[in-house]
A protein has these predicted regions:
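TPR-adjacent "capping" and linker segments in tetratricopeptide-repeat scaffold/adaptor proteins
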Residues: 4-8, 60-75, 206-209, 213
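Residue-level recognition of tetratricopeptide repeat
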Residues: 11, 20, 44-45, 72, 81, 106, 115, 149, ...
């Protein structure tokens, strides 16, 4: 198979074999050209390390296939690679597992099996498979991030944080590692620590590229949770500068403006743009309905809020919002029913207390009381 075909089909091992052969023949420069042609400016860590060794004039040993058993392992791995997305994941997993059993140091086969196990919900097996990648291997960082993700999916949140903290301590100059560590802290509601870690990752970036929007977006969310709205707004705006039109940013910034009662025309336009990009995302539809609601356009808010409720039927916030909308258009019995439903979905304590007040007093009285409290707090 020509290397171009190998790259197209994801058979990285075929490319690696040709690179090693060229190196053994004293054609290291040709091997570098091959890597650059197939991987451009973004080779994976392993291929980047090989390219660096070639640049230094080092000869790369041929170790893709050393024995007949290695050859069988390559055959099963190649079959697994070709089956990805073409058949059920169990059959692909079977071939990847056979390859890694025949050759336990076949890291690509081990990683493929681990990721398939995670996809199939076999998290304990996935964690064990990721753990087989030895420290020092070019894929080790990727394996630990995968292991932490599987631990997260298995509900082992503390284990995920520990794995990524250890990895970040050893790779303090790796933006991807710091980003993953920040994510694990954020999921544990450790927003202060997550904000600091995201900041470390951002500080390492010499030239921002569009993909960096995610770091600013996530840090913005953490800052907002900490009550630092100016910092959050700045991060959301920076994220939007890097990725104009990204619906998640448009929705988050737009909804935040709506919730704060600020920049409402601009907020509505942002959310409408997000809805146009993701018309079946319940949380974005909810934002649109809430933007109409906060602008007093209660009748306009009914249809999108009902759609959001259909898309997210057990979300306490969406259900609470639906109750508010129904109340404002005179459908008060339906509003009370939705508030009771919202309470059954276990909202946060503060939200639950406010919903109960609406059931006890009605939304009009709750809003009036909140307005008086705000005016009193402002010295009005």
């Amino acid at each position: 198979m020509r290397p171009e075909s190998a790259a197209i089909h994801g058979l990285r091992r075929g490319v690696l074999a040709q690179v090693q052969v060229l190196s053994q023949l004293g054609r290291g420069a040709d091997a570098i050209v091959l890597i650059d042609r197939l991987y451009g400016q973004a080779p994976d860590a392993g291929m980047a390390a090989i390219r660096q060794r070639l640049t230094l004039g080092e000869k790369i040993a041929f170790d893709v296939v050393r024995t007949p058993q290695d050859g069988m392992a390559e055959a099963y791995f190649s079959l697994a690679t070709l089956l990805v997305g073409q058949t059920n994941d169990t059959l692909t997993l079977l071939n990847a597992r056979i390859a890694s059993a025949l050759r336990p140091d076949h890291v690509e086969a081990v990683l493929m099996a681990a990721r398939l196990l995670d996809k199939l919900g076999q998290y304990d097996l996935s964690i064990s498979a990721f753990a087989q990648v030895p420290e020092g291997d070019a894929a080790y960082v990727s394996a630990i991030i995968g292991q932490a993700a599987s631990a997260q999916s298995a509900g082992e949140l503390d284990d995920a944080v520990t794995l990524l903290k250890d990895l970040a301590d050893k790779n303090a100059d790796n933006v991807g590692v710091l980003g993953a560590y920040g994510d694990s802290l954020r999921r544990q509601d450790q927003c202060g620590a997550a904000t600091a870690v995201y900041g470390q990752a951002i500080a390492l970036i010499k030239t921002l590229v569009p993909g960096d929007w995610v770091l600013f977006y996530k840090r913005g969310g953490c800052r907002q949770n900490q009550g630092d709205w100016p910092g959050a707004e700045a991060d959301y705006k920076q994220a939007l500068t890097l990725a104009p039109g990204e619906p998640r940013i448009l929705n988050e910034l737009g909804y935040s403006y709506v919730d704060r009662g600020e920049n409402l025309p601009q907020a509505l336009a942002m959310i409408q743009q997000a809805v146009a990009a993701k018309p079946e995302q319940g949380y974005i539809i909810d934002s649109l309905a809430w933007a109409y609601f906060r602008r007093g356009r209660y009748e306009n808010s009914v249809a999108p809020m009902e759609k959001a409720s259909l898309l997210m039927p057990v979300d306490p916030i969406v259900t609470d919002h639906l109750g508010d909308v129904y109340w404002m258009v005179g459908r008060k019995r339906e509003a009370q029913f939705q508030w009771h439903r919202a309470l059954s979905f276990h909202p946060a304590p503060a939200e639950a207390a406010r919903i109960q007040l609406k059931l006890d007093k009605g939304l009009d009285q709750v809003l009036q009381d909140e307005k008086k409290a705000q005016e009193g707090g402002n010295g009005g």
